[in-house]
Amino acid sequence: MTASSSELDARWLAALARLVDRAAHELKGALNGVSVNQEVIRSRAEKPNTSAASVSSFAAAAADQLDVVISLTEALLALTRRAREPVDVGAEVRRIAILLGAAARSDEKRLTIDDATAWSSVGATSAPGSAVRLAICECLLVAVERSTEVRCVALADERAPGMRIESGEGNAVMVEPEIVAAAADAGITIRAEPSAVLISFPR
């Protein structure tokens, strides 16, 4: 039995909920940092003989934390919208990695992905957006849960563009069979290797 569009959407939204839950601490921390630094600036600025230079470092810190908030929120907003088809694989990887990478850092883990040039060579896939996002998100979630070092590598192929998610410690990246089956129904292949998982998308 193949997965319907509504079933794929439901699976993707469940994965997105897990992703957002992982990133929530980082987002709340950045928002709190902006608020605290603004309050410090206000408090110091009210004191007589305070120079602008004495509060500039707090303004810079608030700006850095606001950048984090904007980056996470923009990624989340894009992932809640229907993906444009054909689906840009690299764009979806980057959005998911922004949220999961923030969560990984708070757990003292590291997620790295290839640069934009590498992903541009992968290109787009005809697979449904929900299926593409589901496959990428589930594989990355499992990898980050089981490893402290995870690398996401772009694989360019004329017939089947894809990606390889590698565990730095050599841990197996085993995705739930129902996720593998749902992805396969959409033409996406998820294949586990001893210390990595490969995802291939239909052109």
Predicted feature residues:
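Conserved DHp (HisKA) dimerization/phosphotransfer helix of two-component histidine kinases, i.e.
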Residues: 37, 54-110
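Flexible, glycine-/charge-rich segments associated with ATP-binding catalytic modules
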Residues: 1-4, 149, 159, 172-203
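Conserved catalytic submotifs in the C-terminal HATPase_c
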Residues: 110-123
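Hydrophobic coiled-coil of the DHp/HisKA dimerization-phosphotransfer domain
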Residues: 82, 86-87, 120-129
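Short beta-strand/loop element within the Bergerat-fold HATPase_c
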Residues: 147-166
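Histidine phosphotransfer helical core of two-component systems
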Residues: 2-8, 12-19, 27-67, 123, ...
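Conserved ATP-binding N-box helix of the HATPase_c
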Residues: 17-29, 35-36, 126-151, 176-185
